[in-house]
């Protein structure tokens, strides 16, 4: 029986353990604590999750920081490993892009691994050709 999915716009305490399970399987999020994750969620402007209605499980997630005018930055696009290849990555990103806090922004950006570039290019993202370099400083 095919699954049906529901979009949610918050991750409360009742679903936090499910987000932590998604985070546990990704290299960039696997060391986050519950407290750290709660603070991240609180500081995010947009939170989108996709739940499987059959078992009420969070199977896809993304979050955004935005000034609502010039820039929005998408973080933590994750699809559960057992649900990949079903269009959920595209669906969660589409939900982000259609969110009222994002859809009128001039430029939406994200980080991704090189192997995911074609996936994001199919959704209209492109690599900057302006010679811009990402700079980072740990505090």
Task: Show where each model-derived region lies.
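Short amphipathic alpha-helix that is part of the acyltransferase structural core
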Residues: 1-34, 51, 131
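A conserved beta-strand-loop-helix scaffold within acyl/acetyltransferase catalytic domains
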Residues: 36-54, 59-78
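Acidic/histidine-enriched, beta-strand-rich ligand/metal-binding domains
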Residues: 75, 82-84, 107, 119
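Residue-level recognition of the GNAT/N-acetyltransferase active site
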Residues: 80, 113
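Conserved acetyl-CoA pyrophosphate-binding loop and the N-cap/start of the following alpha-helix
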Residues: 83-92
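Conserved GNAT acetyl-CoA-binding A-motif
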Residues: 93, 100-112
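Conserved catalytic-core motifs of GNAT/GCN5-like acyltransferases
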Residues: 107-111, 121, 126-139
